[in-house]
From Swiss-Prot:
Keyword Lipid metabolism: yes
EC numbers, comma separated: 2.1.3.15
Keywords annotated in UniProt: ATP-binding, Cytoplasm, Fatty acid biosynthesis, Fatty acid metabolism, Lipid biosynthesis, Lipid metabolism, Nucleotide-binding, Transferase
Pathway in which the depicted protein is active: Lipid metabolism; malonyl-CoA biosynthesis; malonyl-CoA from acetyl-CoA: step 1/1
Organism: Ruthia magnifica subsp. Calyptogena magnifica
One Gene Ontology biological process: malonyl-CoA biosynthetic process
Protein name from the UniProt record: Acetyl-coenzyme A carboxylase carboxyl transferase subunit alpha
Gene coding for it: accA
Length: 316
């Protein structure tokens, strides 16, 4: 069993390993047909598995160990990225990356949450859980972008805001609440993209936007499936049941009017074709940025207010 892949991906991985083993043979004259048949079989199996994923399986894909993180996208989506540091109050939180960049030659302010892949990186980025100084840094950069009329682009990928004692002492809840308040009236366009995991207030604190997009196999929820299962069922192993109830996938959120656009993923998920995922993200951002720039600021703010006020409305 390949530990870099999820359990439901294992049949696909086994076929790919067979294809790779055949590809390593120097004289391929006698195995060309066999390789071709295996590739067709692998592609068909991938389509079959990914056409009927459960909400829990999508939740697992959103946290896939090989899924791209914020820093994986920056150099491919943006040009001339210059990182800015610190909240000018306490310190610099590495879990939130921010700075000035260009998207299709247009100056933008970029802010994104970063997790980390190795043990050292996970500690550096605090497993993608921002502290108050991270959210205050984000707000400082947002205010700067408003001053210079630069659109804001945020990448959301966090299990949630850091719940440590120090973070609470430094005003975690206040920092999140202030971001929500300020972002609702920032006089500049805001585009947010959930690239992986959107966890509760930790995600919302950089997610109040004019356009909210999600990758197809990302999630956005008030609580993790495991946390929900622990509360509702007193059993974290029932996370699959909780995931179904939370309606946390991009399809459910789009249907309920909580997000605007779903960005498609390569067959098998982002980790199967990272290069294609970067292209899809960049194209979606450029398209939305070009459209949203056409709106007068007054209209933009009015639309944003209406969007926020419509959250939670439902029909019997």
């Amino acid at each position: 069993m390949n530990l870099d892949y999820l359990d439901f991906e294992q049949p696909i991985v086994e076929l790919e390993e067979k294809i790779q083993a055949l590809d390593n043979i120097k004289d391929k004259a006698d195995i060309v047909d066999e390789m071709g048949a295996l590739k067709i079989k692998s592609n068909a199996l991938t389509k079959k598995i990914f056409s009927s994923l459960s909400d829990w399986q999508i939740s697992q894909l959103a946290r896939h160990p090989k899924r791209l993180y914020t820093l994986d996208y920056i150099s491919h989506v943006f040009d001339e990225f210059t990182e800015l540091h610190g909240d000018r109050i306490y310190g610099d939180d590495h879990a939130i990356i921010g700075g000035i960049a260009r998207l299709d030659a247009q100056p933008v302010m970029f802010i994104g949450q970063q997790k980390g892949r190795t043990t050292q990186e996970k500690l550096k980025y605090n497993f993608g859980m921002p502290r108050p100084e991270g959210y205050r840094k984000a707000l400082r950069l947002m205010k700067l972008s408003e001053k210079f009329s630069m659109p804001i682009i945020t990448f959301i990928d966090t299990p949630g805001a850091y719940p440590g004692i120090g973070a609470e002492e430094r005003g975690q809840s206040e920092a999140i609440a202030k971001n929500l308040f300020e972002m609702s009236t920032l006089a500049t366009p805001i585009i947010s993209v959930v690239i992986g995991e959107g966890g509760s207030g930790g995600a919302l604190a950089i997610g109040v936007a004019d356009i909210i997009m999600m990758f197809k196999y990302s999630i956005y929820s008030v609580i993790s499936p495991e946390g929900c299962a622990s509360i509702l069922y007193k059993d974290a192993t029932k996370a699959n049941l909780a995931a179904e109830s939370l309606k946390l996938t991009s399809a459910h959120l789009k249907e309920n009017g909580l997000i605007d656009i779903i960005i498609d993923e390569p067959l098998g998920g982002i980790h199967r074709d990272p290069s294609q995922a970067k292209v899809l993200l960049k194209e979606a951002l450029i398209q939305q940025l070009n459209e949203i720039k056409q709106l007068p600021i007054e209209q933009l703010l009015q639309n944003r207010q209406e969007k926020l006020l419509n959250f939670g409305k439902f029909k019997d």
